[in-house]
Amino acid sequence: MSSRKKVRVLLLKNKTVPIDKYELECRSKAFEPIFVPLIKHTHVIQDFRNVLNTIPNYLNTINYIIITSQRTVESLNEAIIPTLTSEQKAALLSKTVYTVGPATANFIRRSGFINVKGGEDAGNGSILADIIIDDLSTDIKACPPSELLFLVGEIRRDIIPKKLHSKGIKVREVVTYKTEELSDGFKRFIHAMKECDEDEVFSDWVVVFSPQGTKEITQYLGDSNRLPGSHLRVASIGPTTKKYLDDNDVTSDVVSPKPDPKSLLDAIELYQRHK
């Protein structure tokens, strides 16, 4: 048996198929990735269909779409776009799409959208809203501000709509997927934690991507439960998640500078080198 100590990274997320870039980035750094699903996603197409059915020629009345989740892109690709006519599909893919983070931006481009904005320049919803406001203030097609179609999950934050509404920009939110917490999520997490042999593992990293499904896990990770000398470390995908952890007495040892695999794993690797 190799005496080399391992660095395991427990990713509190569903594994993206066919390729998960967090897994690839972990393995490129000789970290062992372990996925711990906490929620399940279900496509929702009825809201989108209702808009198309009740507003004549709707896709030709808008110029902009907001997408902030890869789950929305999956729902578009797997459940919504296949139901569209060729004309509707062409109209949809011709829109300018605003999004958060490079991973989602790349996914959107692979789906056939050509004009994608935000992406790596927008690390969170607040920054993306500022980009949209700035763009629309100089876009003659948006004067007066046209309605933006915001494709969302059943559970979402209201940062973007609030900022846009404050500037008189209309936003129509349409649900494209819903999420449910897995009843055995905490059990999966504990099982993953107990799999390690402390003589071999140099450290375990728990990466938190979202508050959903993490109530019991945050209690487990709470500062009061982390003993001095513990090999357990916590990373958050960004400042919003860090605040959630702070509010639940969980210290983030690392906060990813950007919500993407390379930024996250580079930050963890840097921490490992200096600790």
UniProtKB/Swiss-Prot annotation:
Single GO MF descriptor: uroporphyrinogen-III synthase activity
Listed Pfam families: HEM4
Single biological process term from Gene Ontology: heme biosynthetic process
Record EC number: 4.2.1.75
Swiss-Prot/TrEMBL keywords: Heme biosynthesis, Lyase, Porphyrin biosynthesis
GO cellular component, one term: cytosol
Main enzyme class: lyase
Pathway: Porphyrin-containing compound metabolism; protoporphyrin-IX biosynthesis; coproporphyrinogen-III from 5-aminolevulinate: step 3/4
Catalytic activity: hydroxymethylbilane = uroporphyrinogen III + H2O
Top-rank taxon: Eukaryota
Additional facts recorded: Present with 1360 molecules/cell in log phase SD medium.
Assigned protein family: Belongs to the uroporphyrinogen-III synthase family.
Function as written in the Swiss-Prot or TrEMBL entry: Catalyzes cyclization of the linear tetrapyrrole, hydroxymethylbilane, to the macrocyclic uroporphyrinogen III, the fourth step in the heme biosynthetic pathway.
Protein name per the record: Uroporphyrinogen-III synthase
